[in-house]
């Protein structure tokens, strides 16, 4: 859910009871969900069931994330992030700990889901993500720290959800949080200015990560050439190659543009190989001295050819129907 390269800000065991200073709501820690530079998230049980509670010793960080969630909640359509439930302080042994409580989104992280269900789901889910990013960008925000750990797949019906808004930044400011593998500055030296193209670079790297679950380290200067070679070395990525490269090179004007490009790749992702007709074998033409032709023999031969032609047309028709059903299935998953 969050970066775990920094030191834990807190380490409370399961069973710890948190009582809000102002609103007096009580939460019991069930387990740790993840932590990062700006706080730690616990699964807690409150009066309304299981929820996620993020705490920090920085009131600025908590306030910033609360403002993001409040902003997201005002956007029409499918929720862009977890629903905000409570904001309060907790006094623990003379220390004031700031926290907020949000909806606990149950599901599987994106990487694990694709590994379990198959890479064919990657394009469908990333297209959903791009729809959400388009809405986020139109509200003046950039997600910033986009990576599979911050993306949960719920359902069925399967739907991708963002679960950690800690890196979300107002458009035009410096990115607050990032993870190197998905960072434009790390790979190509691009700026870490919060703008849609920064998120789209990360989306391209997420697709690469789905094909390389263990990721890989930067070699030498770690320029675009290394990324091109990585894309070209995986058959799963070839149908998305143009979309990924355009995202990495900053050629898309919006998340919507990348989504259109991605869907074009999906529509041609599984061409059905039609059976190749067998080469005709030339047979010696019988002469009158060997075999005398008869009307019944000619009729049977023509019927055989007609049957072969009929079978071929049936095969073509079946292939067309299967292709149409696949396209309808893909677009149905995107709705």
Predicted regions and their residues:
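Conserved short submotifs of the Hanks-type protein kinase catalytic core
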Residues: 93-109
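C-terminal single-pass membrane-anchor helix
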Residues: 273-335
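Terminal C-lobe "cap" of eukaryotic-type protein kinase domains
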Residues: 249-273
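Catalytic-loop of the protein kinase fold
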Residues: 136-154
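ATP-binding glycine-rich loop module of kinase domains
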Residues: 5-7, 26, 30-31, 37-67
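Activation segment signature within eukaryotic-like protein kinase domains
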Residues: 125-126
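Short beta-strand micro-motifs within the conserved protein kinase catalytic domain, predominantly
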Residues: 82-98
């Amino acid at each position: 859910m969050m970066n775990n390269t920094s030191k834990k800000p807190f380490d409370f065991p399961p069973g710890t009871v948190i009582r809000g200073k102002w609103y007096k709501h009580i939460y019991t820690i069930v387990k740790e969900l993840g932590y990062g530079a700006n706080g730690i998230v616990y699964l807690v049980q409150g009066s309304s069931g299981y929820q996620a509670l993020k705490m920090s010793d920085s009131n600025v960080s908590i306030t910033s994330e609360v403002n993001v969630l409040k902003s997201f909640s005002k956007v029409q359509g499918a929720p862009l992030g977890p629903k905000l439930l409570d904001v309060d302080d907790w006094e623990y042994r003379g220390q004031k700990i700031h926290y907020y409580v949000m909806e606990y989104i149950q599901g599987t992280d994106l990487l694990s889901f694709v590994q379990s269900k198959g890479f064919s789901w990657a394009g469908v889910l990333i297209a959903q993500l791009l729809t959400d990013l388009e809405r986020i960008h139109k509200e003046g925000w950039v997600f910033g720290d986009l990576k599979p750990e911050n993306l949960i797949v719920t359902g069925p019906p399967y739907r991708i959800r963002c679960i950690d808004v800690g890196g979300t930044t107002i458009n035009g400011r410096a990115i607050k949080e990032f993870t190197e593998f998905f960072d434009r500055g790390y790979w190509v030296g691009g700026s870490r200015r919060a703008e849609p193209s920064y998120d789209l670079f990360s989306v391209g790297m997420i697709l690469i990560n789905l094909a390389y679950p263990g990721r890989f380290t930067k070699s030498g200067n770690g320029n675009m050439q290394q990324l091109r070679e990585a894309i070209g070395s995986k058959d799963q990525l070839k149908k998305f190659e143009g979309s990924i490269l355009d995202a990495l090179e900053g050629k898309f004007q919006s998340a919507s543009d990348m989504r259109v490009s991605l869907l074009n790749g999906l529509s041609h992702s599984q061409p059905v190989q039609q059976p190749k007709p067998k080469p005709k074998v030339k047979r010696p033409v019988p002469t009158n001295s060997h075999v005398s032709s008869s009307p019944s023999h000619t009729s049977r031969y023509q019927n055989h050819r007609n049957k072969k032609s009929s079978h071929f047309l049936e095969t073509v028709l079946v292939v067309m129907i299967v292709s149409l059903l696949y396209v309808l299935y893909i677009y149905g998953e995107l709705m």
